[in-house]
Design a protein with these regions (language model features):
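Active-site neighborhood of phospho(di)ester-bond hydrolases with catalytic His/Asp-centered motifs
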Residues: 6-7, 31-35, 40, 57-62, ...
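Beta-strand-turn-beta hairpins that frame and shape the catalytic cleft
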Residues: 1-4, 102-108, 165-168, 209-210
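N-terminal active-site segment of His-dependent metallophosphoesterases
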Residues: 1-56
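Acidic, His/Gly-rich catalytic cores of divalent-metal-dependent hydrolytic chemistry
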Residues: 163-246
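Glycine-rich phosphate-binding loop signature in dinucleotide/nucleotide-binding domains
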Residues: 23-28, 103, 144-147, 202, ...
Length: 246
């Protein structure tokens, strides 16, 4: 089994197009998408048009859920413009996607953790704002009851692979479209990828073991940075331009 995992596109259609081209160039046919597809000050409509035509397996992220279960006046600055850009058929397509699913019997997919789409799985935010790899005991608690040998998550925008003591693997492929962001929960913190590249992962099962290849893809990030800046999001513009929000 060999497939690509993408996540956290956040309306960055140019990054998505570049990643899909790279996936094809690597000879990979199957794709799974771990959610947070559209929200952001970029181009939700172009992004969902690409995703709806893509032969892929999808799950929803927390921002996808916000687009479906919150009234526009209660949406945040990333969700409101995305919602306004989508038509009824596109929202219906989004609504049809599950929160979790199993891919080909061996891969468990979720956006954040199996039971909560807003909690970091592989990383912990400390009171001083530092973001670091979580203790293995905490990581394994979230994985209880999952039978699949490979577990995929996203949400943090940080590419990671963690092997559990029982041999299962948890992989976060990183973010296709958002190399940095600021959040307030559980403590104020920033996440910064350090480069503006679009990120995804290729997973391959070989002789009973999962091999992970993280890919960093060059694309016209300056165009997306300019769009974010025009739409009043200077920190995201910095992240898209450089991989740093500060």
């Amino acid at each position: 089994m060999r497939f690509a995992a993408i996540a956290d596109v956040h309306g960055n259609y140019l990054a998505l197009e570049a990643v899909l081209a790279d996936i094809r160039a690597q000879g990979v046919a199957d794709i799974v998408n771990l959610g947070d597809m559209l929200s952001g000050p970029l181009d939700a409509r172009r992004t969902i048009e690409i995703l709806m035509q893509l032969d892929a397996v999808h799950v929803l992220g927390n921002h996808d859920r916000y687009l479906l279960d919150r009234p526009p006046e209660k949406m945040g600055s990333w969700d409101r413009p995305a919602h306004a850009a989508l038509n009824a058929a596109q929202l219906d397509w989004l609504r049809a996607q599950p929160m979790t699913r199993v891919f080909r019997e061996q891969v468990f997919m979720c956006h954040a953790t199996p039971d909560n789409d807003e909690v970091y799985w592989l990383d912990t935010v400390h009171p001083d704002g530092a973001v670091a790899l979580s203790p293995l005991d905490r990581i394994e608690q979230f994985a209880q009851g999952i039978a699949q040998s490979l577990i995929l998550c996203a949400h943090t925008h940080l590419a990671r692979a963690v092997r559990l003591r029982d041999g299962r693997m948890i992989v976060n492929p990183g973010s296709v479209g958002g190399p940095g962001f600021r959040d307030k929960h559980p403590f104020p913190h920033v996440v910064e990828a350090g480069t503006p590249h679009a990120r995804y992962a290729i997973l391959e099962l070989t002789d009973g073991a999962w091999q992970v290849t993280f890919r960093h893809v060059v694309y016209d990030h300056e165009a997306m940075a300019a769009l974010a800046r025009r739409n009043g999001q200077p920190e995201l513009a910095n992240a898209l331009a450089m991989g740093w929000i500060r």
